[in-house]
Amino acid sequence: MRLKDLGERALLRKLAPLGYPQEAPLPPGDDAGGVWADGVAWLLKTDGFLYREVALKGMGPFEVGFRGVAATASDLLVKMGRPLGFTLGLFLPEDLEEGFVLELVRGAAEAAKRLGAFLRGGDTNRGVEVALTVSGYALAEAPLPRKALPGDLLYLAGDR
């Protein structure tokens, strides 16, 4: 079956039994994963972005870098995680201007700073177009799975 016909939820249900441990802090299909260590959950979230798909009108590389970290952090925050750091995986055409890359990373660093966290590393790769992968890690004493229930408070984090 083609992914466009299957859908994300059905795909996640099929992926869940492929090596996902039962004792994980969050259930299969959640937006983040993690491990328990000394009674605290260390959460990890990874998001991938194609620049051309996330750069809204009027956004430059600074805003896209900021948005990448903010989106990744949002998924950790709703799990009751406290973000500690982020890494960036950058895919960059070799003819891209240096200033573009610096602004992209400055935006990501600013978003991390506003969360009391830092950029902690990453990777650069040659790519046919600009893309970024943002991974964030956080601590959570009692992580919340994605299942919202009637009466739960909902918080919106975003720019649109």
Q: Which stretches of residues belong to each language-model region?
A:
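Short N-terminal helix-initiation segments at or just after the protein's N-terminus
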Residues: 26-33, 78-79, 97-101
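Glycine-rich anion-binding loops of enzyme active sites
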Residues: 39-42, 49, 84-160
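Small-aliphatic-rich amphipathic alpha-helix that forms the alpha element of a beta-alpha
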Residues: 61-85, 106-114
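Basic side chains
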Residues: 45, 67, 79, 145-146
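Residues at secondary-structure transition points
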Residues: 29, 59-63, 67, 99
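Extreme N-terminal cap/leader segments of soluble proteins
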Residues: 1-60, 88, 106-111, 120, ...
